[in-house]
A protein has these predicted regions:
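Short, glycine/acidic-enriched loop or turn micro-motifs at the edges of active sites
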Residues: 43, 189, 220
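Active-site acidic/histidine proton-transfer and metal-coordination neighborhood
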Residues: 30, 70, 86-214, 223
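Glycine-rich, proline-tolerant flexible connector loops at the mouths of alpha/beta enzymes
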Residues: 40-66, 84, 139-147
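Conserved beta-strand positions in the central sheet of alpha/beta enzyme cores
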Residues: 40, 77-79, 136, 215, ...
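Short acidic, glycine/proline-enriched helix-loop-strand junctions
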Residues: 49-74, 153-161, 181
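Residue-level marker of alpha-helix boundaries and capping positions
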Residues: 17-18, 54-55, 114, 162-163
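Acidic/polar N-terminal loop/beta-strand segments that form early-domain functional surfaces
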Residues: 12-14, 42-44, 80-81
Length: 241
């Protein structure tokens, strides 16, 4: 409990074309006025952060820290939920998830995946430059369509899926390790990491990579019929965000 500094808010859920939700300054003032102490910044919103610049320039990151700090706030994490989703997309969901990709990469699954991997790696460097120790993201999903037991999945399909998911994420995890930042996967419906067992399977597939951790958001757990209190008992050592 000694590490708790106060409430924080994920800005992505409130972004809008209208003020104050269309600028970093406006959103910082709004959050501070409501009593928040921290903000989680979605990296796909370029008016909130220039991720390319943040990965390259310490001066830019120092200015960003100062700007947020002037409102009495801290940056808690950067988020690559949308880009992380695109690290692994089953073809059945191509059309839906294409909306998360830049226009130039739409209808280009291979290019989209390569872009997503590169972008999440940049977030690792940017996180270090911002003095952050945790990063928020989604795992993506190659197996979500198999969660229901009918039709029966062929033997070995699930194992193959987690092996491929780990193969895509391991180079990213290594970059985060080089930068001293934990990757916190939000346990969420539609992701291959959607409960405790799937988290464990991914952890095993990555050979227990030390940067594989959990973003704990219990808001989905009741609908999934998961015990959100017992989950903490089982996985507290991995909950870093």
């Amino acid at each position: 409990m000694k590490t708790i500094k106060g409430p924080a808010v994920f800005l992505a859920q409130f972004v809008d074309k209208k003020a104050p939700f269309n600028s970093l300054e406006g959103m910082c003032k709004w959050a501070a006025d409501l009593g928040y102490k921290g903000i989680q910044i979605p990296t796909w919103e370029s008016f909130l952060i220039d991720l390319d610049k943040a990965a390259e320039s310490q001066d830019y990151c120092d200015e960003l820290i100062g700007k947020v700090g002037s409102y009495g706030l801290e940056i808690t994490e950067l988020s690559t939920h949308l880009q992380g989703q695109l690290v692994a997309v089953h073809p059945a969901y191509d059309l839906m998830f294409d909306n998360f990709a830049p226009d130039k990469l739409k209808k280009n699954p291979k290019g989209r995946t390569e872009w997503a991997i590169d972008t999440v790696k940049k977030a690792a460097v940017a996180s270090r430059r911002l003095g952050l120790k945790a990063h928020a993201t989604f795992s993506g999903a190659l197996l979500w369509h198999t969660w229901h037991p009918w039709p029966q999945a062929p033997k070995g399909l699930v194992e193959m899926g987690f092996e491929e998911l780990a193969k895509r994420w391991l180079p990213i995890l290594d970059v985060f390790d080089e930068n001293g930042v934990d990757v916190c996967y939000e346990i969420h419906p539609g992701e291959d990491l959607h409960d405790g067992i799937t988290f464990e399977r991914f952890l095993k597939a990555t050979k227990n990579h030390k940067r594989v951790n959990i973003l704990y958001d219990p808001s989905h757990f009741i609908l999934q019929q998961l015990d959100y209190i017992t989950y903490i008992d089982h996985y507290h050592e991995f909950i870093k965000s």
